[in-house]
Amino acid sequence: MVTGVGSGLGKFIHNSLPNSIGIDRSNHAKIMREAKSQSYDLIIHCAFDPKHHVEDYYKYFKDNLQFTQELLEIPHKKFIYLSTIDVYREENSIYKFTKLMAESIVENNCINHLIVRCSALLGPTMRENTFLKLMNKTLTKTGLSKDSEFNYVLYEDIYEFFVQANNKNLVGIFNLVSKDNISLQQVSDYFGCTPQFGDFIYTTPFHISNAVRMYINGSEFLSNRLK
């Protein structure tokens, strides 16, 4: 079973994993009703409402925390939860705290769990973002500074890690990141896109211990992995 299959990593994994059952907003109620009476080898929980500015807190709670609890009540052999390296940020946010609370729910309700904290995700089913606009040369202006730094990992590499982790029955928390961050200027130069940059410098949490670092460096990622 895979959640969040409407777009992003969830959709990519659902399309890549043979015979998997996918959950999105359109079939959520039906699938969850049927799932309680079945048993699953693996549940991969990718769905999350990433809002940083929340207006309806009860809905935010239901979509992110209650849904995680309900998934854990479905009979299963292994549970993989997609988290984020934003939990390492010094500044506090509802996004950070909700991810940490969801992780705690998983840890306390499932012995055979895998929590994977990833950096920024790139793949064919991702929603439009600054990276995609640079790649498509459609970004003309952004509030981000050219010195903003991001850390990217590819859907296909995360999927492969999930498969291998399940086969080897890995348990615990893993940080899945690239070895180096990449500046927005580097990405812009690589794709030959020259937008008007702003002043806001975004930085990615990077000094993370016990990380599975996927690529040699930023240049290797752009030239060899991103094709």
Predicted features and spans:
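Conserved cofactor-binding/catalytic machinery of classical short-chain dehydrogenase/reductase
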Residues: 66-67, 78, 101-102, 154-157
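C-terminal substrate-binding subdomain of Rossmann-fold SDR/epimerase-dehydratase oxidoreductases
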Residues: 144-146, 153-227
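SDR active-site strand-loop-helix element
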Residues: 3, 43-46, 79-85, 116-118
